[in-house]
From Swiss-Prot:
GO biological process assignments: translation
PANTHER family: 54S RIBOSOMAL PROTEIN BL35M, LARGE RIBOSOMAL SUBUNIT PROTEIN BL35M
Stated family: Belongs to the bacterial ribosomal protein bL35 family.
Name of the protein in question: Large ribosomal subunit protein bL35
Origin organism lineage: Bacteria, Pseudomonadati, Chlorobiota, Chlorobiia, Chlorobiales
Gene responsible for this protein: rpmI
Highest taxon of the lineage: Bacteria
Pfam families: Ribosomal_L35p
Keywords: Ribonucleoprotein, Ribosomal protein
Record bears the keyword Hydrolase: no
GO molecular function: structural constituent of ribosome
Assigned GO CC terms: cytosolic large ribosomal subunit
Record's keyword annotation contains Cell inner membrane: no
NCBIfam families to which the protein is assigned, alphabetical: rpmI_bact
Length: 64
């Protein structure tokens, strides 16, 4: 059988922390920031963690 390949799009969007959790960036934080208030744009630049079944799916996609 051929090797399992990791999903390259998932590898670029998600990172695995040292404790094994999946970290992601928030959406809508890259452009049109002058329309969004300062509190919202600050919050959009913070990363967050995935939870539950989505985290299991992404971890499987990253490891290949």
């Amino acid at each position: 059988m051929p090797k399992m390949k990791s999903h390259r799009g998932a590898c670029k969007r998600f990172k695995v922390t040292a404790s094994g959790k999946i970290k992601r960036e928030r959406m809508n934080g890259s452009h049109n920031l002058e329309k969004k208030n300062r509190k919202r744009s600050r919050r959009l630049h913070q990363s967050t963690l995935l939870e539950g079944t989505k985290a299991k799916q992404i971890k499987q996609m990253i490891q290949g």
